[in-house]
Amino acid sequence: MQIYVVKPGDTLFSIGRALGLAPGFLARYNGLQEPYRLAVGQSLLVLYPEQTVTVQPGDTLTSIAASAGTDVASLYRMNPNLSGSDRIYPGQILVTQLEQAARRPAVVSGYAYPNVSERVLRGILPYAGALAPFTYGFTPEGALVPMDDERLLALAGACGVQPLLHLSTLTAAGAFSAAQAAALLRDPALQQTLAANVLQTMLEKGYEGLDVDFEYLGRDLAEPYAAFIQLLRDTLAPYGLPLITALAPKTSAAQPGTLYEGHNYASLSTASDAVLLMTYEWGYTYGPPMAVAPVGAVRRVVEF
């Protein structure tokens, strides 16, 4: 695997010739569609197929996978143009083995709205280890705000992807409320009710883990929040269900700001089975032009 950075005058075909790779494979692995416009500075993923097969009449993905000594999930990963569909046709060329395998394991997870395009999701799930439908909120009484997540759970199950219940401060009115979170964190009985409802929903729907994302809590609620996370973990642990806590991207313990002060890295890390650094909050629609997650900024958070 390598990364090629587009230079002035490059085309998909000139890059393919220079790298000894069919332009069609470049397009396939980078989600490019005709007329294959490229931007100077754009990074292209370069993967070299080591083995391919031409689909014959009567072939299915299952039969091709068996003949190639692989599985259908791997075929989906090596052939993103399939978009998770099992529809193939005679004469189609499928990759059954890449020249270079991944050198180290990676865990890939993501969030998805319930109305996400099925085609988009099917194209992504073969590469994912976990999927969190976005999002479950809660009422002032500690009940979960319902979410139409059945379709996403079915797709995750079909692709062998672990479903995570995402818990946030969403209200029944559809807005995120730090005030409602504050009321919860100051009421131990309400926390017990919410924890029980979370567990019940996870067991009923087949969720295999919990991802908690409470933001803009402020310094005063940092320790109560960590205690709530510990309560959730203690509730889930007997059932073998892990808890992940989303952390705001901090670079120092004293970093000012309501978003950062509410997340005590040490306390939350101790109370959680795993943490997710939300290092995707820099580049956004209404901010200055930049990458969603600039490498330098991400590195500073990880090093802290």
Tell what function each PLM region has.
Residues 1-19, 42-69:
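Primarily a LysM-type cell-wall glycan-binding module
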Residues 111, 132-134, 164-168, 211-215, ...:
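A cross-family glycoside hydrolase active-site/sugar-binding cleft signature
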Residues 114-117, 136-140, 169-174, 216-220, ...:
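Solvent-exposed loop/turn segments at secondary-structure junctions
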Residues 140-147, 223-304:
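Substrate-binding surface in catalytic domains of secreted glycosidases
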